[in-house]
């Protein structure tokens, strides 16, 4: 940005460990148009920051949030622990499949919103939901997938290990007036065991794991709840194939597969899979 030159903001040199600006992250709501800028800096003080903000907002009125993250470690991890709101809100708002979501600097939110809607709608269609269904949303994040399911079912139970994401999911449920979605910060295995003891019997378990896929312990814990269906959203075909094979060993049958291209002209692909229980 021109501001970097005008205000002499030096980029961080990883080898020399000099400079101020490590990363500039821009988030933009596809439907809202709201923008967030996140400056990742090596130290707390940004010289003439008020003037920088004034210039940015004047040139880009869609910017509703400017955040500073401080990362003084010699690491390739993008964010440090401390976030400061320099201007506006600490979130921006966007919508997906009719629901609104507050998105913070740390929130996971698909960058290709239009195709993410197709991805989630495919998962909904595959699951063939009824008003009596109970859905467990493992790896629930800020609630984007589970809340998309919620209007079609009796209840959604979401679990996520990142506490901030769980708070975001609860806030997003309230933002949309959704009262049948419940979120906890826990490991999926432990949460499912607790829910099972409390008599919760899911008809669908929804999973959207990271690239490493599911653990064997997770698969065993999910199978123990005996859901009729497992709807699996994957970003890694190799680990997805491995996990499907294990589900098949536990009595589940692969019913449907649909790739969805969220990242055109790359080798990355998202895939929605439906498995159903054929025996106990």
Regions found by a protein language model. Give the residues of each.
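Internal alpha/beta scaffold segment
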Residues: 1-15, 19-20, 42-67
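Short edge beta-strands and adjacent turn/loop segments
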Residues: 18-31
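Short flexible coil/turn linkers enriched for glycine and charged/polar residues
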Residues: 30-33, 62
């Amino acid at each position: 940005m021109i501001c970097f030159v005008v205000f002499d903001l030096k980029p961080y040199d990883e080898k020399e460990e000099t400079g101020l600006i490590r990363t500039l992250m821009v988030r933009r709501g596809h439907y809202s148009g709201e923008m967030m800028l996140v400056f990742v800096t090596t130290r707390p003080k940004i010289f003439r920051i008020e003037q920088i903000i004034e210039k940015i907002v004047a040139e880009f009125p869609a910017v509703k949030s400017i955040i500073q993250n401080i990362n003084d470690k010699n690491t390739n991890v993008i964010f440090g622990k401390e976030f400061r709101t320099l201007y506006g809100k600490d979130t921006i708002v966007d919508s997906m499949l009719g629901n609104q979501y507050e998105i913070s600097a740390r929130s996971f939110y698909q960058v290709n919103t239009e195709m993410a809607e197709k991805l989630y709608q495919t998962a909904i269609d595959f699951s063939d939901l009824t008003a009596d269904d109970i859905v467990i949303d493992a790896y629930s994040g800020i609630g984007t997938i589970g809340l998309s399911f919620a209007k079609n079912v009796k209840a959604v139970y979401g679990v996520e290990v990142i506490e901030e994401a769980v708070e975001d999911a609860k806030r997003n449920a309230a933002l949309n007036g959704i009262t049948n979605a419940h979120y906890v910060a826990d490991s999926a295995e432990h949460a499912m065991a607790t829910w099972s003891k409390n008599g919760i019997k899911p008809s669908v378990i929804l999973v959207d794991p990271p690239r490493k896929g599911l653990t064997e312990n997770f698969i065993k814990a999910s199978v123990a709840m005996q859901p009729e269906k497992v709807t699996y959203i994957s970003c890694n075909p190799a680990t997805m194939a491995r996990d499907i094979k294990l589900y098949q060993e536990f009595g589940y049958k692969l019913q449907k597969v649909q790739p969805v291209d969220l990242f055109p002209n790359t080798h990355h692909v998202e895939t929605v899979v439906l498995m159903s229980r054929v025996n106990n």
